[in-house]
Amino acid sequence: MLSLKKGITKSYILQRTFTSSSVVRQIGEVKSESKPPAKYHIIDHEYDCVVVGAGGAGLRAAFGLAEAGYKTACLSKLFPTRSHTVAAQGGINAALGNMHPDDWKSHMYDTVKGSDWLGDQDAIHYMTREAPKSVIELEHYGMPFSRTEDGRIYQRAFGGQSKDFGKGGQAYRTCAVADRTGHAMLHTLYGQALKNNTHFFIEYFAMDLLTHNGEVVGVIAYNQEDGTIHRFRAHKTVIATGGYGRAYFSCTSAHTCTGDGNAMVSRAGFPLEDLEFVQFHPSGIYGSGCLITEGARGEGGFLLNSEGERFMERYAPTAKDLASRDVVSRAITMEIRAGRGVGKNKDHILLQLSHLPPEVLKERLPGISETAAVFAGVDVTQEPIPVLPTVHYNMGGIPTKWTGEALTIDEETGEDKVIPGLMACGEAACVSVHGANRLGANSLLDLVVFGRAVANTIADTLQPGLPHKPLASNIGHESIANLDKVRNARGSLKTSQIRLNMQRTMQKDVSVFRTQDTLDEGVRNITEVDKTFEDVHVSDKSMIWNSDLVETLELQNLLTCATQTAVSASKRKESRGAHAREDYAKRDDVNWRKHTLSWQKGTSTPVKIKYRNVIAHTLDENECAPVPPAVRSY
């Protein structure tokens, strides 16, 4: 009890749930097929909405729903502020006009061009129009943006961004918190989630969607702390689980980026979209893959080859080092192939920052100065950083409308069809605002704009507190059977061996440059790796804090994403954005301006491919005209 004034006391009994919510119903134990028989304790919960993932997109959706009065559960396999959003460095795009006059329509033009005309223009219209409002909202929540001398939000230059629809030179549109923007955003959003009493279930590993007659009705999850299984009933299930960068050997992604939500959706019989488009960031630290933000080039850094040449002037005469990421990554790869790489093996290039004033490095780039020292042994004030293109982002994911509703294809009409009960946002989703190539600093924007869109859509379509329909008592038991099979796997291959084989295959065969031969070999190799999962060995048979089990379940998810990535890439016979074919060197809008949809029900099953049209119109053509396809040059 806290004494406020004489005779007045206040009791603080505010409940915030971090590991479990009040149990709605605990049902009997379920026997497994293992010998001796094991038992799984299943606990049922009922919520209006459940959000899977507690990064930027998941938190924004979750607290938006809680704030609107919905009983909301947020599941995360790790503590929310350890989500991969924390690693985003450079900033968040919005046409605030703090450094020069700017217009969100120019931002839209740059995003469509950056997507290589594969982005859906209704969603891009919505995102860029909402961007200024979203950034100001973050500021009001307390996000500590860097400031100009007159107190406005500081904005830096980033790749692929221009003034006046590509005619006015480099735009300064990226709002930054030094080089730790994602860290600041994640903590800001987490604070709002706590304020609005979101129910958190932390260190719960979501295994599968619960479906009933084609409708998603919740998720089933494994509580790593006590080994119990939890079924979460929900009228709306939101997937915000991030990307699957760990399918590759060298990536900037956290070890937790394993495509869990994508694989859950795939196992439920729904499609994934555009998985062939994997972004390679131009500046991962050579040898470790740690990210050096594009903001380093935005502040004036530049790339050098072994001859000391600023080679980007040959590949992108206007934008130079601030061309879009796919262009810069290909240029670096071509320099290395031409023998102009640096180092003993001539297999990387250099990022020069030592010419920048020390105060700029200290104020604007403190994090990467430390990262370069720790992971490359480099003092950025004295010497360049060795860098190499590194897997960074998945443009593909769960096909989603700009409202956040997940999509599939109607078997009879071939038209888009909303999946009842399922929504997605963030890197797990494919809205598609990034198309074939994401612009730097559009990812943090994507998180908050579409996380909020999910909450708004649900608020417009669902009444809080509605009762749940009765379901079969054995719903989710197929997922438990898979958990039991994996936990008791007694094969000859360690999880780490299979994972390494997958990562090496993807790194070699589905990389920056692709040909039909390498892609076909990649499909064969990843299919063989996929089959070896049946021979996996899990040493730890327990249910409590079993990291061996969790990593094996994550590998199962990664294999689903990796296989569909390789197959989708082998089918697309053109070069567009991050998908660069040496045997089909040009973009083909007539035959290939369309989204790839892929289905795969489970590990070691065939991948089915279909296509859906790119949305070439905006939300309101009187407000904003669509951007017609054109030659993409920087």
Swiss-Prot record:
<keyword id="KW-0813">Transport</keyword>
<dbReference type="GO" id="GO:0005739">
    <property type="term" value="C:mitochondrion"/>
</dbReference>
<dbReference type="Pfam" id="PF00890">
    <property type="entry name" value="FAD_binding_2"/>
</dbReference>
<feature type="modified residue" description="Tele-8alpha-FAD histidine">
    <location>
        <position position="84"/>
    </location>
</feature>
<dbReference type="GO" id="GO:0050660">
    <property type="term" value="F:flavin adenine dinucleotide binding"/>
</dbReference>
<comment type="subunit">
    <text>Component of complex II composed of four subunits: a flavoprotein (FP), an iron-sulfur protein (IP), and a cytochrome b composed of a large and a small subunit.</text>
</comment>
<dbReference type="InterPro" id="IPR036188">
    <property type="entry name" value="FAD/NAD-bd_sf"/>
</dbReference>
<dbReference type="GO" id="GO:0045333">
    <property type="term" value="P:cellular respiration"/>
</dbReference>
<feature type="binding site">
    <location>
        <position position="427"/>
    </location>
    <ligand>
        <name>FAD</name>
    </ligand>
</feature>
<dbReference type="InterPro" id="IPR015939">
    <property type="entry name" value="Fum_Rdtase/Succ_DH_flav-like_C"/>
</dbReference>
<dbReference type="InterPro" id="IPR003952">
    <property type="entry name" value="FRD_SDH_FAD_BS"/>
</dbReference>
<keyword id="KW-0249">Electron transport</keyword>
<comment type="pathway">
    <text>Carbohydrate metabolism; tricarboxylic acid cycle; fumarate from succinate (eukaryal route): step 1/1.</text>
</comment>
<dbReference type="InterPro" id="IPR037099">
    <property type="entry name" value="Fum_R/Succ_DH_flav-like_C_sf"/>
</dbReference>
<dbReference type="GO" id="GO:0009055">
    <property type="term" value="F:electron transfer activity"/>
</dbReference>
<dbReference type="GO" id="GO:0005743">
    <property type="term" value="C:mitochondrial inner membrane"/>
</dbReference>
<keyword id="KW-0999">Mitochondrion inner membrane</keyword>
<feature type="binding site">
    <location>
        <begin position="53"/>
        <end position="58"/>
    </location>
    <ligand>
        <name>FAD</name>
    </ligand>
</feature>
<protein>
    <recommendedName>
        <fullName>Succinate dehydrogenase [ubiquinone] flavoprotein subunit 2, mitochondrial</fullName>
        <ecNumber>1.3.5.1</ecNumber>
    </recommendedName>
</protein>
<dbReference type="InterPro" id="IPR011281">
    <property type="entry name" value="Succ_DH_flav_su_fwd"/>
</dbReference>
<comment type="function">
    <text>Probable minor catalytic subunit of succinate dehydrogenase (SDH) that is involved in complex II of the mitochondrial electron transport chain and is responsible for transferring electrons from succinate to ubiquinone (coenzyme Q). Probably forms a catalytic dimer with SDH2. Electrons flow from succinate to the FAD bound to the catalytic subunit, and sequentially through the iron-sulfur clusters bound to SDH2 and enter the membrane dimer formed by SDH3 and SDH4.</text>
</comment>
<keyword id="KW-0560">Oxidoreductase</keyword>
<keyword id="KW-0809">Transit peptide</keyword>
<feature type="binding site">
    <location>
        <position position="438"/>
    </location>
    <ligand>
        <name>substrate</name>
    </ligand>
</feature>
<feature type="active site" description="Proton acceptor">
    <location>
        <position position="325"/>
    </location>
</feature>
<keyword id="KW-0274">FAD</keyword>
<feature type="binding site">
    <location>
        <position position="392"/>
    </location>
    <ligand>
        <name>substrate</name>
    </ligand>
</feature>
<keyword id="KW-0472">Membrane</keyword>
<keyword id="KW-0496">Mitochondrion</keyword>
<dbReference type="InterPro" id="IPR027477">
    <property type="entry name" value="Succ_DH/fumarate_Rdtase_cat_sf"/>
</dbReference>
<feature type="binding site">
    <location>
        <position position="293"/>
    </location>
    <ligand>
        <name>substrate</name>
    </ligand>
</feature>
<dbReference type="InterPro" id="IPR014006">
    <property type="entry name" value="Succ_Dhase_FrdA_Gneg"/>
</dbReference>
<feature type="binding site">
    <location>
        <position position="260"/>
    </location>
    <ligand>
        <name>FAD</name>
    </ligand>
</feature>
<keyword id="KW-0285">Flavoprotein</keyword>
<feature type="binding site">
    <location>
        <begin position="76"/>
        <end position="91"/>
    </location>
    <ligand>
        <name>FAD</name>
    </ligand>
</feature>
<dbReference type="GO" id="GO:0045273">
    <property type="term" value="C:respiratory chain complex II (succinate dehydrogenase)"/>
</dbReference>
<dbReference type="InterPro" id="IPR030664">
    <property type="entry name" value="SdhA/FrdA/AprA"/>
</dbReference>
<feature type="transit peptide" description="Mitochondrion">
    <location>
        <begin position="1"/>
        <end position="25"/>
    </location>
</feature>
<keyword id="KW-0816">Tricarboxylic acid cycle</keyword>
<feature type="binding site">
    <location>
        <position position="281"/>
    </location>
    <ligand>
        <name>substrate</name>
    </ligand>
</feature>
<dbReference type="Pfam" id="PF02910">
    <property type="entry name" value="Succ_DH_flav_C"/>
</dbReference>
<dbReference type="GO" id="GO:0006099">
    <property type="term" value="P:tricarboxylic acid cycle"/>
</dbReference>
